[in-house]
A protein has these predicted regions:
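Acidic, low-complexity terminal tails and accessory targeting/binding regions
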Residues: 2-6, 75, 86-100, 162-203
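Active-site-proximal alpha-helix that buttresses catalytic centers in soluble enzyme cores
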Residues: 2-78
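Generic beta-sheet signal
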Residues: 8, 52, 144-154
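Short, well-ordered beta-to-alpha junction loops that form the rim of enzyme active sites
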Residues: 14, 57-59, 83, 133, ...
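Short, active-site-adjacent cap segments at secondary-structure transitions
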Residues: 17, 61-63, 86-87, 156-158
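Phosphate-handling substructures
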Residues: 31, 71-135, 184
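Active-site catalytic microenvironments for nucleophilic, acid-base chemistry
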Residues: 46, 68, 72, 139, ...
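Conserved histidine-centered catalytic loops in small-molecule metabolism enzymes
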Residues: 49-82, 104-112, 162, 189-203
Length: 203
């Protein structure tokens, strides 16, 4: 039996205020910069083919990136899924901070290398994050959409790609370290599009 492949575009949001060193408090409310809004408009040109489904995370910067594509394809179904960024530091601990000011907290988190550790309110553990990634892959597998455009975030997209390489890998400290190395060595540019093909069993 021939397996029908589904095309998925994993699109990182365009330039945000956090990306250029702006002070932020709520991870969900970080907006795009003026440059990021222009980049979002330019993304539309990549869509030669009409998508079957447009998906975005609930975070503002992803929704703003998706908006020009939604404007072009007004009749295409749009949904918001749990494909938001991995927030592993509690927002309460980094209110009104810049990326450099958060770096000691970030370094401490990865050095701990405990997949079950949760930093506090508004944060999630690495294990829970990977559960969310697997949940999104399951949704993509189950939806009747030949071409799905997913507007998401660098850590989430990297996790999807990493998980697809070895779906049965246990989520332990070794896996967490491997993921971190992948993230550090292969950063995704703002506005980048990564295409994956999923078969009928989600691989």
């Amino acid at each position: 039996m021939r397996v029908k492949l589904k095309k998925v575009w994993l699109i990182r949001h365009t330039e945000s205020e956090a990306n250029v060193g702006g002070r932020t408090s709520d991870p969900a409310a970080i907006p795009l910069t003026a440059k990021g809004r222009l980049q979002a408009e330019q993304l539309v040109a990549a869509f030669i083919e009409k998508p079957s489904l447009i998906v975005s995370s609930r975070y503002l910067r992803a929704k703003q990136t998706a908006q020009p594509v939604r404007n072009k394809f007004k009749r295409v179904r749009y949904e918001e899924w749990d494909v938001h960024e991995f927030t592993f530091i509690s927002p309460d601990r980094c209110h009104d901070t810049t990326k450099p000011e958060r770096e000691p907290l970030v370094d401490a988190y990865w050095q701990r290398c405990d997949p079950n550790y949760c930093d506090g309110k508004g944060a999630e553990s690495f294990s829970d994050f990977m559960g969310r990634v697997c949940g999104a892959l399951k949704q993509l597998k189950e939806r009747d959409a030949a071409f799905c455009a997913v507007f998401s975030h660098m850590q989430f997209i990297t996790a999807v790609l990493w998980r697809l390489e070895d779906p049965s890998r246990p989520i332990d400290s070794k896996a967490m370290k491997d993921y971190q190395l992948r993230l550090d060595r292969n950063p995704l540019p703002n506005g980048s599009i990564t295409e994956v093909l999923l078969d009928s069993i989600g691989n």
